[in-house]
Amino acid sequence: MVNLSIFQQYLATDTPLLQPLPKSFNSDEQHLRKWAALLPLQAKMQQIEQLEKVLTELRTANIDDRQRLTLFNIVLDAANQLIALLRQHYIYETQAFNAYQLDYVAQVKSLYYLMIMGYDGVIKREIILLADNESQPTTNLWQRYFTNDRSSTITLAIATYQTLLMYQKLLFEEALCYQKPTASLWFNINQLYYMACQQRTVNIDVSAYIPTHCADTIHQLYAQLCLHSLLNVRAMRRANILMVQRLLLEWSEHLIITVEPQTETKVFVNLNSDSAPTYLTAHCAINPYDAHHDCVFIELAALVAHLTSRRDKLIEEGREGAEYCLLNTVAMTLSYRYIQPRLTLPIKQSAKQEAYVITGFNDIHYRVSDEQSLSSLIAAKDLPDHQQPRYETSPKKQSANLTSTHTMLKVETFESNNDLSDFRTLHLLLHSEAPDVGASSDGKNTPKASYSDKKVEDIIDTDKNHVLTSIEPPSLRIMSLFLLCRPHQSASPDWSIGVVRWREMDNEKPEIDWQVLGHQLIACGIRLHNRDNRSRHFVPALVVGGDEQLQTVCSLIVPTSHFQVGDKVMMRIDSKQKTLRLVRRLMMTEEFSQYEVVQL
């Protein structure tokens, strides 16, 4: 098995000399196709061993590189079939990967490393060949163009494209593991694109020579790699990461990458660095607009316009499901982070204080209701069967009066009483005590249990030089709803409800940009009052009071997929009921929807 350290060491050394094919290996194309067809009949481990052996022998075989690429394509198809089976063991996991799943991840990444190692030799040899041809005297320019130079250029373009494709798949695996890609991966990616620009292969349509499924040119593939990084997918649920990766082809067609910026964009890539796409700030190491830096600039406005148009079309068609929520989240995230970044309050050390956040709609509702279940809050015993809640908000723990510790996180806030901005920053404190955020009788907070948002569940030693760690998916994700509970001594709680707009994943204290939705909260139950065929069972809801400083109106936050604009709903607390109308939708994510409401 090849791990990252072996892979990096191989790329850092000179390409090994080509060796004669072993007698046991047949380089005939038809023979290899027959081998690939029979490969799935074997056990998975045997398939992996055979693929590793064939890839190694093809890499060092003394054959023409055009023939090598043809044979590589056959092996690549066989490897992709096996990889698809291996990935089924972990891509739908909702929690941290266990050791069993990490073993499959390691096997998949090993195959990708081996493929890159094979293509790397082709790239180096073709670059040397093109340089030699360039230095030779020009005797017959047309003949040279249609023979050596042209075929070498196509071979180089195909090898570069396939290498970038393998790097894309590696980055996809890192994202599913919630692991930060190593700097060397992005250095290699940037260098490949830079080389393709220099060799003028970046816009060659390789679909005329090999099957392509995700892009036709090196430039299009690089655009997908950049977009995947800009979307900060590690701050999403794993299911959404998979959906983003499937939609990259469509989305990247609206991404514009140029050497000369077309607008005042601040998103760029330094092609001579190991950095992923970066947003220009005062802390950047370089000024990308200086001519002596080799940078490309990324324009996102056209992509956001496409996402918004697609989202609006789904609304018209009444298809406001998973794709709609993802489109909405991505469009809002790109606008917030890169196009029209909102000014968050400067971090004031004098105003720093520790607080706690509760995530998960049901846990938030349970806390705001003073730890009452939904049935208790709305006196469900007095309701007919067709209005009874179908589920409870109380945590499923040994003790019913405990809030789920897995949704409680300790944070640092940087606010003061006169803060007017609705966009703020907090720091997540890892490996911290997660106390009961409800005040005890003496007004003090009481600790409950330890919690770490980034905990190592399992470690698999796939090689003595490489260790894979299992990372818990973040509970505070982009567009996550949360309740911020500040320390308080009075009877009334000091809290705010907000939504995550951006999360930095790699700091010691992960930084979270969030939007305040309100401070005055009431927990209640809501049911549909319309006379149609939809369910009329009560569901949990939160009334958010309007705020003059935040310039917000009274609104209702409910779990997504229950209601729509124009609905007449019944709000209930104890036995008291009020009729409301949902006037306008203010926000919708896969977790919650927020509506402006009026009382009827």
Named regions from a protein language model:
Residues 2-226:
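Long, leucine/valine-rich, helix-dominated scaffolding and oligomerization segments
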Residues 3, 26, 62, 73, ...:
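Detector for Asparagine
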Residues 75-105, 326, 330-335, 498-502, ...:
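A broad "ordered helical/assembly scaffold" signature
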Residues 108, 114-116, 122-123, 134, ...:
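Generic hydrophobic, helix-prone segments enriched in Leu/Val/Ile
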Residues 195-395:
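Extended, domain-scale alpha-helical bundle/helix-rich regions
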Residues 329, 338-491, 497-523, 527-600:
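Short strand-loop-strand
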